């Protein structure tokens, strides 16, 4: 639920390495 400061409209979340996932075109963690 916390934004990771990264969008994932055209590319995947690089922050996935620290547990972030793409939700509504923005990367979130929990």
Curated annotation (Swiss-Prot):
Q: Where is this cross-link: Cyclopeptide (Gly-Asn)?
A: 1-30
GO terms under biological process = cytolysis in another organism; defense response; hemolysis in another organism
Going by the entry's taxonomy, the superkingdom of the source organism is recorded as Eukaryota
Q: Name one Pfam family in it.
A: Cyclotide
Q: Does the keyword Endoplasmic reticulum apply?
A: no
What is known about the tissue distribution of this protein?
Answer: Detected in stems (at protein level).
Protein's UniProt keywords contain S-adenosyl-L-methionine: no
Q: What S-S linkages are listed for this chain? A: 4-20, 8-22, 13-27
The record's account of how the chain is modified after translation: This is a cyclic peptide.
Q: Which UniProt keywords apply?
A: Disulfide bond, Knottin, Plant defense
Instruction: State the domain notes.
Output: The presence of a 'disulfide through disulfide knot' structurally defines this protein as a knottin.
Q: What does this protein do?
A: Probably participates in a plant defense mechanism. Has strong cytotoxic activity against HUVEC cells (LC(50)= 0.58 uM) and various cancer cells including HeLa (LC(50)= 0.48 uM), MCF-7 and K562. Also displays some hemolytic activity. Binds to and induces leakage in phospholipd membranes, particularly ones containing 1-palmitoyl-2-oleophosphatidylethanolamine (POPE).
Give the family, as the similarity comment puts it: Belongs to the cyclotide family. Bracelet subfamily.
The name this protein carries in UniProt is Cyclotide hyen-D
């Amino acid at each position: 639920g916390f934004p990771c400061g990264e969008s994932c409209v055209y590319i995947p979340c690089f922050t996935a390495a620290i547990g972030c996932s793409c939700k509504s075109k923005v990367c979130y963690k929990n």
